[in-house]
Amino acid sequence: MENFDKVKDIIVDRLGVDADKVTEDASFKDDLGADSLDIAELVMELEDEFGTEIPDEEAEKINTVGDAVKYINSLEK
């Protein structure tokens, strides 16, 4: 499973949004209705799924689904 698909599954599960709404350009707040607590929980779940720690200063830069995928991909290089 690609990282995008893993991230998408986590978002759908955590936020309860329709999978069709989860695109790389989708904003967590504006398009998916996430608040700051939802985003913090998503970051923690991404950390667990990908076995990493995302520093707060990096987590603050993750505003879209694509941002999250790019960050995860950057860890694997």
Curated annotation (Swiss-Prot):
Gene3D superfamilies: ACP-like. GO terms for cellular component: cytosol; membrane. 4'-phosphopantetheine is transferred from CoA to a specific serine of apo-ACP by AcpS. This modification is essential for activity because fatty acids are bound in thioester linkage to the sulfhydryl of the prosthetic group. It comes from the Bacteria. The keyword Glycoprotein does not apply. Keywords: Cytoplasm, Fatty acid biosynthesis, Fatty acid metabolism, Lipid biosynthesis, Lipid metabolism, Phosphopantetheine, Phosphoprotein. It holds the Pfam family PP-binding. InterPro entries: ACP, ACP-like_sf, PP-bd_ACP, Ppantetheine_attach_site. GO terms for molecular function: acyl binding; acyl carrier activity. Pathway: Lipid metabolism; fatty acid biosynthesis. PANTHER family: ACYL CARRIER PROTEIN, CARRIER DOMAIN-CONTAINING PROTEIN. This is Acyl carrier protein.
